[in-house]
């Protein structure tokens, strides 16, 4: 079940490393955690490395608490929940979702996106 609506979500202190406004990150976390059962949220890729360019998108990984639905459905719901916010902020994005157990299994395999998330990602929630 999605979490109940909240306001003033606290984002992790590591999120201050990102060049994304805190208000955008907080609203993104609120929207995603309201849409899907969320364990954690990471930003990875060029924004996490602080190498973003004007054409860069924000890469987001949502780790879910539950495997009640397929990851694609969780990703779709999470993506729909932040679409307007990201558009209004002028940010393109890619969003992936993983079940927690699948992420934990894959994050040590250097050929997976999960490995990149684990090694360069910035946890903004969870």
Descriptions of predicted regions:
Residues 1-40, 49-54, 64-126:
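Catalytic core of pol beta-like nucleotidyltransferases
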Residues 46:
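Conserved H-loop
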Residues 59-63:
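Short beta-strand->loop micro-motif that forms the acidic, two-metal-ion catalytic signature
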């Amino acid at each position: 079940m999605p979490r109940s609506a909240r306001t003033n979500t606290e984002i992790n202190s590591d999120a201050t490393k990102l060049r994304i406004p805190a208000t955008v990150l907080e609203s993104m976390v609120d929207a995603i955690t309201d849409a899907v059962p969320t364990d954690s949220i990471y930003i990875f890729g060029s924004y996490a490395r602080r190498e973003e360019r004007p054409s860069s998108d924000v890469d987001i990984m949502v780790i879910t608490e539950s495997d009640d639905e397929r990851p694609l459905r969780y990703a779709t719901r999470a993506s729909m929940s932040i679409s307007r916010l990201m558009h209004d902020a002028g940010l393109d994005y890619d969003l992936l979702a993983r079940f927690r157990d699948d992420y934990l299994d894959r994050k040590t395999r250097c050929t997976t996106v999960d490995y990149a998330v684990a090694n360069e990602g910035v946890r903004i929630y969870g």
